[in-house]
């Protein structure tokens, strides 16, 4: 069993909900990374045999034993996300576009579980433009409202955002996020906001227009069963006191409610525990989401 350190990431749209679960004193924490190994951020293991190691090293040394040898790198990133403001209108590339623009094997699909739904009751998801040509024309003219589509969401909803879908999380969202391990995000529009220095964040309009599929939509689903996507599966567990990994690969338990002490470490919202096959963890009636790589 490996307990993973959390990593706070401040953003222009972040808030205060994650501040109690990190040593970073900020009212702008957008992401609390629960498990990440993407070159920019690297999780560490806090306990046991691998204490002090980067998760990347653990994965590289053990992936064959864990039936994950088909992955060059760990396939997903886990985080809690606090959006006190709307995120930028953006898109992630599919595999084909990612290979062309990023020289990587995979694009990025992602899933959101809404612990708290946005204040408006809807997120940005999908595109109203009927063709790529119409999309390009509207973006060139700054007519963003003409192309933005919306999706209604409520507390407890699960939303799968497929690569190529134009999207943005909306203000008030508090989300468990699992995303494929690709760093590529192309901003279409950032609502003309500026940072503390008065600067706008850069847009990646040309790449975004290549990556957006105007036919891609998203839908909200109830999270009452295991969700199996391309590179990962997830399942929600509530009020659990003991959990055993009965799979043939590692599983990641990310706490979304409750706290406990395990091996002298405080386990709380945002903490991820990695269990190898047949390992068991005893917990104090905790709510968590189990994620597992597809093998």
Could you tell me what each predicted segment is?
Residues 1-130, 185, 191-219, 234, ...:
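Transition-metal
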Residues 73, 82-86, 117-120, 165-185, ...:
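Ligand-binding loop in jelly-roll beta-barrel domains
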Residues 78-79, 87, 110-113, 150-151, ...:
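His/acidic/aromatic-lined binding-pocket segments of jelly-roll/cupin-type domains
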Residues 128-141, 247-254:
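Short, basic/aromatic beta-hairpin or loop at an interaction surface
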Residues 138-147, 158-160, 166-216:
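An exposed, glycine/acidic-rich loop-and-rim segment of catalytic or binding clefts
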Residues 148-160, 261-281:
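Short acidic-glycine-tyrosine-enriched beta hairpin
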Residues 231-237:
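A surface-exposed beta-alpha-beta supersecondary segment
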């Amino acid at each position: 069993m490996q307990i993973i350190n959390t990593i706070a990431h401040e953003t222009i749209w972040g808030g205060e909900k994650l501040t109690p679960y990190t040593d970073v004193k900020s009212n702008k924490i957008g992401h609390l990374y629960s498990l990440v190994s993407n070159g920019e951020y690297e999780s560490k293991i806090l306990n046991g045999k691998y204490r002090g190691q980067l998760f990347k090293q653990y994965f590289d040394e053990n992936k064959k034993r864990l039936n994950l040898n088909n992955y060059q790198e760990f396939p997903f990133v886990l985080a809690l996300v606090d959006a006190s403001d709307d995120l930028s209108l953006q898109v992630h590339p599919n595999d084909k576009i990612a290979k062309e623009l990023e020289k990587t094997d995979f694009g990025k699909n992602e899933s959101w579980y809404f612990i708290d739904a946005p204040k408006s009751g809807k997120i940005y998801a999908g595109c109203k433009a009927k063709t790529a040509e119409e999309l390009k024309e509207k973006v060139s003219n700054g007519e963003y409202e003409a192309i933005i589509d919306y999706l209604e969401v409520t507390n407890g909803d699960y939303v799968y955002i497929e690569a190529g879908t134009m999207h943005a999380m909306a203000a008030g969202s508090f989300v468990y996020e699992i995303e494929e391990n690709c760093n590529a995000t192309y901003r279409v529009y950032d609502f003309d906001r500026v940072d503390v220095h008065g600067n706008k964040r850069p847009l990646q309009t040309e790449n975004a227009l290549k990556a957006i599929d105007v036919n891609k939509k998203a839908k909200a689903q109830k999270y009452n069963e295991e969700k199996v996507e391309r590179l990962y599966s997830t399942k929600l567990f509530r009020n659990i006191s003991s959990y055993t990994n009965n799979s043939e690969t590692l599983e990641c338990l990310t706490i979304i409610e409750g706290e406990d002490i395990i091996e002298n470490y405080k386990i709380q919202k945002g903490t991820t525990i990695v269990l190898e096959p047949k390992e068991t963890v005893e917990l104090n009636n905790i709510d968590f989401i189990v994620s597992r790589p597809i093998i």
